[in-house]
Design a protein with these regions (language model features):
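Short beta-strand "wing" residues that participate in macromolecule-binding interfaces
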Residues: 56
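Glycine-centered, phosphate/nucleic-acid-interacting loop/turn motifs that mediate DNA/RNA or nucleotide
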Residues: 52
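Short, hydrophobic-biased segments on the C-terminal half of alpha helices
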Residues: 45-49
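N-terminal compositionally biased, intrinsically disordered segments and leader/signal-like regions
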Residues: 35, 76, 110-112
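Basic, amphipathic "hinge/linker" alpha-helix immediately C-terminal to the N-terminal HTH DNA-binding motif
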Residues: 63-86
């Protein structure tokens, strides 16, 4: 598995969406979960697969009408690494929010 060299907010959103699922998911569900455009999500999924973080397979449900869906799921190593990245992001966001709250004025007016 290759490391992700540029961890962007959209990449973290895709990782988080995949982590939130108990089973393989198709791209449209990732798009809906992240609120990101298909032109953002699918290249991220392709890159994650190329780097060994996730694997994909085609849904072979012959009873379901419509086009086949490509399903995405983590590799064993990818799931652990993704959890670490997403947890680190949450910790950083929480720390930034605490710092912002600590720096806010108390709401009291100071007069001279």
């Amino acid at each position: 598995m290759e490391p992700i060299h540029r961890v962007t907010a959209p990449t973290l959103d895709v990782l988080d969406a995949l982590l939130s699922s108990d089973s393989a998911v198709w791209g449209l569900l990732v798009i809906k979960a992240t609120g990101r455009q298909a032109g953002t999500v699918y290249p991220i999924l392709e890159r994650l697969e190329r780097q060994g973080w996730i694997r994909s397979s085609w849904d072979d449900d012959a009873d379901r009408p419509g086009p086949r869906r490509r399903l995405y799921e983590f590799t064993a190593e990818g799931a652990g690494a993704a959890r670490e990245l997403v947890d680190a992001r949450r910790s950083a966001v929480d720390a930034a929010e605490r710092a912002a709250r600590a720096g806010r004025p108390s709401g009291r007016t100071v007069t001279s």
